[in-house]
Amino acid sequence: MTKLKFRFHNSIILITIFFQFSCSSPKEKREVVLFNSYCTSCHIAPSIQDLPKEIWATNILPEMGARMGVRDSTYNPFKGFTFSEINIINQTGVYPLDPIISAADWKLLQEYIISMAPVSLEKDNSKNTYNELVQFTPKPISFDSINGSFITLLKLDHDHKLICGNISGELWEFDFSNQKISPIGQFGKAIVDYTELDGITYVTSIGDLHPSEFSSGQIFTIENNITARIPEVLHRPVHTLVHDLDENGTNEIIVSEFGNLTGKLSLFKKVDSVNFKKEILLNQPGTIRVIAKDMNNDGKEDLIALTSQGNESITILYQQENLKFSAQQVLRFSPVYGSSWFDLIDYNGDGFDDIITVNGDNADKSYVQKGYHGMRVHLNDGSNNFEEKYFYPLHGATRVVSNDFDQDGDIDFGLISTFPDYENEPESSFVYLENKNPDTFSFSAYTFDASKLGRWFLMNSEDIDDDGDIDIILSSFTYAFTPVPELLYELWNESNLDLMILENKLITKDKL
């Protein structure tokens, strides 16, 4: 059934391309039509100018050819995979057995892309300028004496305590007030999400941290000190939302199964005390976060999801009757953008939720510093049509937190970059944008010298010291995803720093 499904998908691609050729202008060059046809069948067409020739030639085009069934003796898409995983990949149909493009057209398409691509990306020699961060006081935290840090979970519970998990599956609670660490449990593999709701704790393990088509992720539940496992095995889940969407008194579980070549957004409805029924809401890889919010004022909570692989997009899934959903993509991004996170907040105070996105995931086949990485503000016109109104460039941007951190009535932002330009701007791994004028999108940017002490991977915000203002918490993951200066890499791995708490000094307990 799976093979038939993907053969049908490839047939649809061919039909789409046929009509695009049929409707194209006779004056339009064939190579342009080929690019606009084949490069839009699964996602929006990237700008050829967004990547240099070498990356197109050595990384992108060979993979693109494999996905169109073109065999290349210099490139093996299955290299490094075990036989059993190759079998799983073959069943997906991602790499079709028969070519969907002729050899002549494939040669023409490659030559066109290489001829149009720049030798290198234009560099903006004007660096971001930063002020010294004074509103927040950096407070480094170490959980143990072990050098390096591999934190994969950073959340807060209802008592403002930090919940942390690591690559080894260890889960613990950290009380900032007394610096006490309390173990919660050991779950075998990297922990990526944690939720406490209605007396039940939900713990999500990704399974394979590295890209894989194997499904080995799990959700554990803890109730009355008894740990159980939801029977369904998941494909690299990275985010779990536990929420009573239809307000019937029973929580649903919405799981972002990031996957790899394939993936999905899944809904689990409880059948009995042990079993769940699974429904697929989005059948595409790279789902990284989902938020529940009524987006059309019909009294039903909808789902807003970010997908970050290939067809990078924000989708609103409008809730219908009987927990059915109607999906609408409201934002689409180039497949080379590296979408990483989003937030939903009413930026301009007009009563409609706007979307804040960051893109900068650079641990892929196209590693190079990219001037289009950064944060974007997309304003809602009131009918869930979103338009980009502001862009703040930041190499390798991966997370954003949005709040009125200085309590002056507008929205400020905290940004982290897991893939900054460490050679020239290591301090840009964290940036605080203080909003000076929300109407003109005027911001002052701040950072702190100690920001280079960790490779910031996760970020959260909460009033962790209970003094009335919102603090920012950063966690470090010192794995070398991408090239890093040797001195900096040594600094991370000779240090036992795990967290950096940016304590907001706007309000102190002495003032209360």
What would you call each of these model-derived segments?
Residues 1-30, 34, 38:
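Bacterial Sec-dependent N-terminal signal peptides
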